[in-house]
Structure formats: C-alpha cells, structure tokens
Amino acid sequence: ELPEVETTVRGLRKVLEGRRLNSVTPRRADLRRAIPEDLGQRLTGARVTGLGRRAKYGLIETDRGDTLVFHLGMSGRWRIDPQDIGKHDHLLIVTDDGRTLSLNDPRRFGSLDLLRTDAVAEWPPFKAIGPEPLGGAVTGKWLKERFAGRTAAVKLLLLDQRIVAGLGNIYVCEALFRARIDPRKAAGKVSGRKLDALAAAIPAVLDAAIAAGGSSLRDFAAPDGELGYFSKTFDVYGREGEPCGCDGTVGRIVQGGRSTFFCPACQK
C-alpha cells in the first residue's frame, strides 16, 4: 500500500540518490509481466538523480533520462546489502560505493518497467489514476463531486484508483473508521460533513503509517530490514470481535472480495 511504498522510497533514497550504478542485473525475464530486455544495459553506468512515488509505484530517475518504475506487488521488498542472494532476489544493483540492493519478491506479483523520464506522466497506468491522497488535492468537495449519484459502497469507490491514487484496503478501513462512515453506505448518500471528515482522515492515517514505517503484515519490511509498526495501532483492521472503544465491537464483512473491518455501532 502507499505508506509501504513511501517508506521504501525514503529508505532507498538514503542509499541510491547521487550514486552511480556500477551494475544492474535482472535475474529472471519476468515478474508479473516481462522485464524490459535492455533494462540492465540502459541503467548500468547511470547516476541516480532522484527517487519518488506515484500511487503504489516507486520511481528511480537517472541522468540518462530513464526512470525505473517498480511495483512491490503482494510480497516484494528491496533489501540493502543482503547477506545472501536467493532465488527470490530478481534484480541486483551494485552502486559505485560498493552497496548492493536486491529486489526480493517471492510471489512475483510485482513489476519492473523502464520509461523515458519525460514520458512518465503519460504512461497508461499513471494517466488513468486520480490525485495523490497526500498534498491536499483530495478534499471533501472533490469526493462529493466524484461520489455524486453513485450507489456503490463508499469503501469500494475509495479503492478505485481512478478516484484517489494509492489507497489500499488497510488504510481505507482505518480512514472510514476515523470519519465514522459505514463502509457499506452508498457513496452518493454520504453527507458533505462526513466527506470533509474523510478527506481529513485519509492523509492523517497515511501520514501516521509512514511515520511508523508502514504496516508489517506478512512480507513487508523497509529496505534496511526494519519492520513497520503502524499495525500495532490499528483501530479496526484485523480486530474482528475486539472492543471498539465506543462500547461496540469490531466486525468483519467481505466487499469486493476483500475483508472490511468496521464498527457497526459508531460508523453510520
């Protein structure tokens, strides 16, 4: 999810920014889709000029006008100076100061793409997605306009990357709880007051998760191996049957094939 990718980018920035890539070696031909055949050739010898994030994708820009775009999928993570290289380490990078980075992805649902930097904004996956939830672009007014007349559940629309970029299941559950919105409610029926609360809750939840290093569920760890600790402060996610704090009990339903955690007593 977005906080995990942001945490990853910040960790990589400390090691990669300004460094020359002495070698870049893909160790297989594909992940979720094919890895560009010329990726190693185009990146070897390049200097990293910046790192960033768009939605759930990480971006590594170079002085050759190329940008490496990575997606971690379900189980991907970058490792810095790994003690051993195994079968799940699918891309190796060695920098000019002797650091080694590996992209490790046991389930291979991630991806690696190499784009011309001046064409990144026009890449089809980026053209189709909505604004970033951090930075103030997503307001109650914005949500009201996007939700107008929609009968789909508000939770499902928040997961639609065309409306807001980068939101995933965990943080949508948490934001809806903070805004006291029932995830089953038709999006077009949510009041303007509650949409204002939701627009404030989304960045608050994400900022807190980034500050805590993300949520270490299953496979995620930052590049330096540190685990994220936001999961220890979840209000509802993964807490089915536990008390809410409002005298209610956290429940679980399935929406769109994913678990939704919420408190039926205080989320209306």
What residues fall within each predicted segment?
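Glycine-centered flexibility motif
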Residues: 34, 45, 55, 76, ...
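Generic detection of long, well-ordered alpha-helical segments
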Residues: 2, 133, 137, 191-199
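Short, contiguous clusters of charged residues that form electrostatic/catalytic patches at enzyme active sites
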Residues: 3, 7-10, 141, 145, ...
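Basic, nucleic-acid-binding surfaces and adjacent catalytic neighborhoods in DNA/RNA-processing proteins
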Residues: 20-38, 52, 63, 80, ...
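Phosphate/anion-contacting hairpin/loop surfaces
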Residues: 68-166, 171-178
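Surface-exposed binding/hinge segments that line
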Residues: 1-111
